[in-house]
Each structure stands twice: as structure tokens, then as C-alpha cells.
């Protein structure tokens, strides 16, 4: 059949050509007539069939106006079309002349309200550093790359995705100011969108310089005459009957002179000097002294980032290390003597699936990703639960049958409208499943009191991000409910070395997400990940936020080839390490904050529990009965 049709084609074409020649004078207009009827600006093709070429954006949209569909035909990419169309529509008033359109599309200046702006200004008009668009700290942004895919919400550059009449803006890194406009150049004019108005005090995230004089050793040797606390309360005289009663049975250093009512640090509190005060819930408050910067890893003989002392190196062996209870059982409750020894593991001399990795890290082991936890792996894990709407709020940890430890920002953080009371919350203990009620295993308890550290700094950097929760009544311990130990100075000195690994557990999201439905990233059961401690200089260099002695960071460095991190929902949960000397688990940190989840060059930051242990003891001693 093909052989029959082939030879006929030339004949057909010849007949058609002849027909056109005979009748053309009746069908076609002369060139001059046609030009007079069709007055249309003509575009010269630069090549064969130029209009159907991929990526011909120049012809379709720049030489004359185009539709979104035409832009998509040229770009053949939805994301690229979104990005181009956002700028193109923002530049509608600058279509002519062509040079003005080019300047607008380049985006280094603001046209109109500045929705076209794509420059690199990342500081607000008052000098505050902009928050990363992908970050939820310090503010939870309702505008992000998912809600506004064409707005070029990269890094922390000023943008105007919502068409604000004041021009490009950003969320700020100051928890006290949610968003502020930026000062960017206006296209074709010698002015900026808004004038610069410097704030008194400058950026909230800058590293504050040390004063020339500072108080060393956390005020242990302080002999000054300050007698007023951070809240302005006047100190009680140490010789007063009330102060004597409160000092009874306290482990004070007899070498510290308790003169008059001056601030002192007789118990070696890592928070510094303090005094008793009248009519306060805890009967004591800290004093506002300028302490010298002395990282805890330094005064513990543990300089994160340096090799541990070879004489103290752990070669996979364990030795008996006598455990000394720290708290008064009358106020603390039961469980400390047996803390950190899991009923389904240490008490049965059974290892869990990944604890070997922790021991290997003490002699240079590997990092693994997060995975489902074994049942009973973290019997101190607590779920902080909101009553209405019913939802997982945060993680927490059981430290006795009466007390729970969590992060302060889980309870009080005004930028996220958090200010919870005991009536808003309950705790669920002994859980493994995230959503299912585990009958005969989990216990649900109401709260009696919430105690947030008095110097918790939500306004700047979440310093002292710690809170104590007192249960309504003691919880019954079991194979699935068991307290974790809090570290003493010796344990912290032995375990807090860069590269040594700890463990984070929680029901938080398995990856960062902006979608309204997060079911696909929520785990069904408790997750566990082992993470290495990171050198303090690396922690500080990874963020613009001011890092204090009350924090440490952990996670992976770029290029190490492994991933994992705490994420949203894990906050308040424990960072624990297992001592190879006595086989007990110690809570070294509390999941506090991070910039995104599992991002290269970014680390998770944790509240340093040992640094704040004296505060924990004082609250429990005063208020635990």
C-alpha cells in the first residue's frame, strides 16, 4: 500500500500549484493593499519557527504584554512561571520604556509597593536582623514559600509577598517585634521606600561585649554590697529568723561570709549570687551581677572541641561508679535512687538497638538517622498535652514520681500566643504511640503547679529555657514509667565532650513542613535519634542568635553524610546520655530551639540541665512539700 501512495504525491503538489497560479488574482490582495488594511507592529523572527522554541520569554512577554499561559508556554515550568509572573505583574506600571521594565524585573529596586523586589537587604528600617523565611523562631510566619511560591522567599531577604502598602518587609529576629518594613531603593528615584529609624539599643541578636569588670566564678567569691534582686526585691538579712529557717539543712560553704543582707552564692549555684526575699513563692531570688563568660565546659574541665584527656578515655569498658542521691525525698518524691535504670533494659541487663552507638562515640563511633523507638526505651518520656483543642504540645521528662521537667517556651512564649496555666494542660506518661490511648500502660496526670525559671529570656534568645511541673499526685512507676537521673558535676565532666553522642526522643515532625496537614510527617510511635555534641565555637558560628553558657548544641556537620535532628513537637523533651561508669541514663539537656529542622550547617540547641540544677533543687526544696 505504501508503494502505491508514494509516487502520486508529486503529481498532487503540481496540480495544486497550477491551480493557485490560475486563481491567485481573485483570491489574494496585493502587498500594498494588505499593508493598508492590517496596521500591526511586526516582529522579525530571529530564526526558523522562533515562536515555538522553548524558553522564548523575550519574544512572548518582554517585547509586548503576554498572558500567564504564554509565559508558561515559554518557560515550561510551573515554579519558574510562578516566580516570573509575580515579578511581571508587579512591574505592570513599568512596562514602558523597555529599560524601565528591565530595571523593575531585575528586582534590585522597588517599583510601586515593591512586590518586584528581589534584592539582598536583610535588615529592617530600625536595624533588626530579619528572620529566615523558612524558620519558625522567634515567630511562626503565616507567609512562607508554600503559601507564596512565586515571592522568592529566600534566606532572610526583605520581600513584599502580601502587597503591604509600606513596601518590602520581613519577620524580625526580635521576639518583641513580629514584622517590620525595610528600607530599599525605589526604582528610578533617588530615595528609599521608608526612612531608616535606628532603635535604641540596636539589634537584639548582636553579641553583647563584656564589660571591663566582671564577677568571676559565678559569684562564689563575690563580697560586694549588692542587696537587691533582679526583680527589685530587697534581700532579707541572713541573720533573720526567716532566712535561718530557710537555710536549715542547706549545703552551704562555711567559707562564704553571710554578712548583713548582701547577695552571696554559698551553695555554688551555677546561676550566681542570690538571697532570700520576703513574700515570694520560692523565698529566694537571683541578683543581677555582670558575670564573666565562663562556659560550663571550661569550668568542668571539658573544653568542647578538644580531645578528651587520654587518662579519662573510655575504651568500651564500664566500671562501678557509686550513685549519690541529690534531692530530698520528702520534697522530690520517689525514684531518684533507681533513676536512669530502665526496667526493660538495664534491670534485665539488655541493651537497646542503638545504645552501642553511644558507647562507640566515646571512642569515635558513627551517626544514624532517627527511627522508631523500642517499647520502654525511654520510660521517662512525657507528653505535654493540651486539653482544648486536644493536641500534643511538647515533650517533657519524668525526674521523680512527682516532678516533670520541660522547656519554658512550651508554656510561655508570647510571640506564639503561649501562656498556659495548669488548667490548660495535662501530662501523659508511659506512652509509645503518638495518638492511641494505651490502656493499662500510660498514665494521665493533672498538674498542680508550674514553675518557670525567673530569668527565662523569651525576649532575646530563650536563655534558661527550663520549667518544672508538679503533678497533682505521685505517679505509679512501672516498666514503662521510670525517672531519668539529673547529672552531677563529675558526670557532666565525663560525658560532655564534642563528638560524644546523646539521644533525643519525641513525637515531633519527621521533617520540616509548611503544609496545613502534617499527618504525612508525623510519626505513629515515639522516635529516637542519636546526635553528637558540637564544639562551642562551631555552635556560636552557626547562628546570629546570642549563645549563652546555659546552652549547648548537637547535630551533624555538613559533609558527614548522616542526618537527623529534633523538630517541631520535640521541644521540651530530653537529651540523655548513658554513663558507661554506672550504666545510668542522665538528662544532660532539654530540647530548646533550632533554625529549621535538619538543615546543613545548623544545629539543635539544648538547655544545659547541669547549669540549672541548683535552681531545680531550690524550687523543689521550697515548694515540693
Curated annotation (Swiss-Prot):
Catalysis performed (reactions): Selective cleavage of Arg-|-Gly bonds in fibrinogen to form fibrin and release fibrinopeptides A and B
Propeptide positions: 25-43
SMART domains xrefs: GLA (SM00069), KR (SM00130), Tryp_SPc (SM00020)
EC number: 3.4.21.5
The Kringle domain, residue ranges: 109-187, 214-292
Tissue expression notes: Expressed by the liver and secreted in plasma.
Site label Cleavage, positions: 199-200, 317-318, 366-367
S-S bridge residues: 61-66, 91-104, 109-187, 130-170, 158-182, 214-292, 235-275, 263-287, 339-485, 394-410, 539-553, 567-597
One of the GO BP terms on file: protein polymerization
Extent of the signal sequence: 1-24
Database matches in CDD domains: KR, Tryp_SPc
The record's account of how the chain is modified after translation: The gamma-carboxyglutamyl residues, which bind calcium ions, result from the carboxylation of glutamyl residues by a microsomal enzyme, the vitamin K-dependent carboxylase. The modified residues are necessary for the calcium-dependent interaction with a negatively charged phospholipid surface, which is essential for the conversion of prothrombin to thrombin.
GO molecular function: calcium ion binding; fibrinogen binding; serine-type endopeptidase activity
Gene Ontology CC annotations of this record: collagen-containing extracellular matrix; extracellular space
Misc. comment: Thrombin can itself cleave the N-terminal fragment (fragment 1) of the prothrombin, prior to its activation by factor Xa.
Protein name, per record: Prothrombin
Gene this chain is encoded by: F2
Amino acid at each position: 500500500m505504501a508503494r502505491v501512495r508514494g509516487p502520486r504525491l508529486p503529481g498532487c503538489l503540481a496540480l495544486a500549484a497550477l491551480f493557485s497560479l490560475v486563481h491567485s488574482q481573485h483570491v489574494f490582495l496585493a502587498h500594498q493593499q494588505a499593508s493598508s488594511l492590517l496596521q500591526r507592529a511586526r516582529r522579525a523572527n530571529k530564526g526558523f519557527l522562533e515562536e515555538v522554541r522553548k524558553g522564548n520569554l523575550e519574544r512572548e512577554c518582554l517585547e509586548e504584554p503576554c498572558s500567564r499561559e504564554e509565559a508558561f508556554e515559554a518557560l515550561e515550568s510551573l515554579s519558574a512561571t510562578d516566580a516570573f509572573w509575580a515579578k511581571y505583574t508587579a512591574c505592570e506600571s513599568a512596562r514602558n520604556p523597555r529599560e524601565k521594565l528591565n530595571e523593575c524585573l531585575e528586582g534590585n529596586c522597588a517599583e510601586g509597593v515593591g512586590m518586584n523586589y528581589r534584592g539582598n537587604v536583610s535588615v529592617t528600617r530600625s536595624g533588626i536582623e530579619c528572620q529566615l523565611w523558612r524558620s519558625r523562631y522567634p515567630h511562626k510566619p503565616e507567609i512562607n514559600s508554600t503559601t507564596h511560591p512565586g515571592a522568592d522567599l529566600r534566606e532572610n531577604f526583605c520581600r513584599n509577598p502580601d502587597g503591604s502598602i509600606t513596601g518590602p518587609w520581613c519577620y524580625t529576629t526580635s521576639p518583641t517585634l513580629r514584622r517590620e518594613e525595610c528600607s530599599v531603593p525605589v526604582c528610578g528615584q533617588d530615595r528609599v521606600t521608608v526612612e531608616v529609624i535606628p532603635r535604641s539599643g540596636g539589634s537584639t541578636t548582636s553579641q553583647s561585649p563584656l564589660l571591663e569588670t566582671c564577677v568571676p566564678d559565678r559569684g562564689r567569691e563575690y563580697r560586694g554590697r549588692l542587696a537587691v534582686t533582679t526583680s527589685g526585691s530587697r534581700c532579707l538579712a541572713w541573720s533573720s529568723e526567716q532566712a535561718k529557717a530557710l537555710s536549715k539543712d542547706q549545703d552551704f560553704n562555711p567559707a562564704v561570709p553571710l554578712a548583713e543582707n548582701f547577695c552571696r552564692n554559698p551553695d555554688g549555684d551555677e546561676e550566681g549570687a542570690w538571697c532570700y526575699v520576703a513574700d515570694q513563692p520560692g523565698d529566694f531570688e537571683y541578683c543581677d551581677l555582670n558575670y564573666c563568660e565562663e562556659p560550663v565546659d571550661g569550668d568542668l574541665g571539658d573544653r568542647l572541641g578538644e580531645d578528651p584527656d587520654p587518662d579519662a578515655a573510655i575504651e568500651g569498658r564500664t566500671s562501678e561508679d557509686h550513685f549519690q542521691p541529690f534531692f530530698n525525698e520528702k520534697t522530690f518524691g520517689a525514684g531518684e535512687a533507681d533513676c536512669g535504670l530502665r526496667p526493660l533494659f538495664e534491670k534485665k541487663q539488655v541493651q537497646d538497638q542503638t545504645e552501642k552507638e553511644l558507647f562507640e562515640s566515646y571512642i569515635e563511633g558513627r551517626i544514624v538517622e532517627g527511627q522508631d523507638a523500642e517499647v520502654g526505651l525511654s520510660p521517662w518520656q512525657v507528653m505535654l498535652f493540651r486539653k482544648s483543642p486536644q493536641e500534643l504540645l511538647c515533650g517533657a521528662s519524668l525526674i521523680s514520681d512527682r516532678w516533670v521537667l520541660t522547656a519554658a517556651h512550651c508554656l510561655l512564649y508570647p510571640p506564639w500566643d503561649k501562656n498556659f496555666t495548669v488548667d490548660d494542660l495535662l501530662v501523659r506518661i508511659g506512652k509509645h504511640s503518638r495518638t492511641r490511648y494505651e490502656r493499662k500502660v500510660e498514665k494521665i496526670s493533672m498538674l498542680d503547679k508550674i514553675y518557670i525559671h525567673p530569668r527565662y529570656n523569651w525576649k532575646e534568645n530563650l536563655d534558661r529555657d527550663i520549667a518544672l511541673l508538679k503533678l497533682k499526685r505521685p505517679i505509679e512507676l512501672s516498666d514503662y514509667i521510670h525517672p531519668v537521673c539529673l547529672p552531677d558535676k563529675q558526670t557532666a565532666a565525663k560525658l560532655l565532650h564534642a563528638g560524644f553522642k546523646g539521644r533525643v526522643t519525641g513525637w515531633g515532625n519527621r521533617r520540616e513542613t509548611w503544609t496545613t496537614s502534617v499527618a504525612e510527617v508525623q510519626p505513629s510511635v515515639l522516635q529516637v535519634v542519636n546526635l553528637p555534641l558540637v564544639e562551642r565555637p562551631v555552635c556560636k558560628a552557626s547562628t546570629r542568635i546570642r549563645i549563652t553558657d546555659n546552652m549547648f548544641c548537637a547535630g551533624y556537620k555538613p559533609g558527614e553524610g548522616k542526618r537527623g535532628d529534633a523538630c517541631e513537637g520535640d521541644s521540651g523533651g530530653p537529651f540523655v546520655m548513658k554513663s558507661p561508669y554506672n550504666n545510668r541514663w542522665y538528662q544532660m539537656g532539654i530540647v530548646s530551639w533550632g533554625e529549621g529542622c535538619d538543615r546543613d550547617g545548623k544545629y539543635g540547641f539544648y538547655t544545659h540541665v547541669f547549669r540549672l540544677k541548683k535552681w531545680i533543687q531550690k524550687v523543689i526544696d521550697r515548694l515540693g512539700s
